[in-house]
Amino acid sequence: MRRYVLIYLVFLSIGISRKTIVKLATLAPEGTAWHGMLIDMGQEWKKASKKSVQLRIYPGGVIGDERDMVRKMRIGQIHAAAITTEGLSEIVPEFSAYFVPLAFQNSKDINDVTEVLLPSLEQKLEENGFILLHLGELGWVYWFTSKPIKTPMDLKTMKIFTWAGDFKWERLWEKAGYNPVPLASVDILSGLQTGLINSFSTIPLYALS
């Protein structure tokens, strides 16, 4: 399973003016390569617009989790967000197709599915007031745990991070006999330090950050 980062802009949320400031939120921690790419993008925007468009980045989840970002885009507090499929499924539930465990064996599988699904997903995003600006891949999702896990049964002894507010996945974990612990993603580190959780799944880039 591969996680995607996508950047969206709400229709008509930014008025036309001589100087436009685009407010963009992301979970990417400040100082990481991920954050650096957004800074570079902002510099390109500034150069291309002759300084009339400036990108203001809110990194590290300072304005909240991805669901908060989506909500704040809808009410115009921010204009864009670099989000994963977790945030996207809040807008268009069909993005949950990318969550299915072991459904994708390689990059070709991902590309083939995306080629078929993306036109309809983009249309549904636009119907909900969002525009896709960029689609990028950050890598495969892995499990990170406080002790070795070799089988799905081993994972049943762990306290598993789940995204706060994602009730459907929380119920699925519970129904399968696991122990989900809903948390905001910005609280993963403190949750690990206090023992509130001891396992989570993400891409290596985010885990190292």
For each predicted feature, which ranges?
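Sec-dependent N-terminal signal peptides
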Residues: 4-12
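N-terminal secretory/targeting leader peptides
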Residues: 7, 18-108, 125-209
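A gly/proline- and charged-residue-enriched helix-loop-helix capping module
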Residues: 108-122
